[in-house]
Swiss-Prot record:
Keywords annotated in UniProt: Activator, Cytoplasm, Nucleus, Transcription, Transcription regulation
InterPro entries documented for this protein: OCA (IPR047571), OCAT2 (IPR043265)
Tissue expression per record: Expressed in tuft cells.
Subunit architecture: Interacts with POU2F3 in a DNA-dependent manner; this interaction increases POU2F3 transactivation activity.
Organism domain of life: Eukaryota
Function: Transcriptional coactivator that specifically associates with POU2F3. This complex drives the development of tuft cells, a rare a rare chemosensory cells that coordinate immune and neural functions within mucosal epithelial tissues.
Name of the protein: POU Class 2 homeobox-associating factor 3
Amino acid sequence: MSEKPKVYQGVRVKMTVKELLQQRRAHQATSGANLSGSSGLHLPDTTMPSSAGLYFEPEPTSSTPSYFQTREFSTCVSCEEIPSCLDQIFESYLQTDTLPEPLLNSAQIAPHYFPESCQVAPFCHNQSLIPGSPSDSSSLSGSFDCSYSPTQLPSYTPENYSSPPSLDSLHSSLPEEGYFCQHWPSHPQYNHSSPATPSSVCYYASCEAEHLDALRTTEFFSYSGMDCADFAPPVATTGDFYKRETSCDACYS
């Protein structure tokens, strides 16, 4: 007997819930139609005061000129757009009131400086030129080019480079770092400033690649701090040098 009322009550509750839902849906449909009709009539009355407040509130507080109107506030409704509108207002106000004075001052001061700069520049250029010469671009470029002219370069070439067949001229073009190595063996009378013989030139030019390692290890590093004029080579190095000199003579023959 106890199970039947529970099933009956449960079924009865489900039926009542369905009925309540149907009633609520019907009531919402009817009330929604009534609210839509009433809201269409009453909405303009509720929105007009707020829009009127937006249009008419800034008028008594604004002390700006006549060109500043309240139409800008009509677009600035959200709180995020209000600072940008205020910045635009301040910029427009500062540009119209404060900027004309510096502009007038700069317009008056500028003519005093620009003519002076325009007059001083030709005067400086004319000082470097010959008096009476025209001051066009060709003469100015010629005056600046006179400081460094490429035609002066061949005057130094005969001093450093002579005729190629002569061996002394070839030796004069060689660097001095490898020059003193030629005077070490068997010719102590040649100092650092004396010219070299053709055999020594052959030794530097053709035979240097063959005996470069031997010269660096035995002669150059051991006697690098001594003078070439005061150097007395040992007997073994003189014999090696005569052998090398004869081989170099064979190269020329």
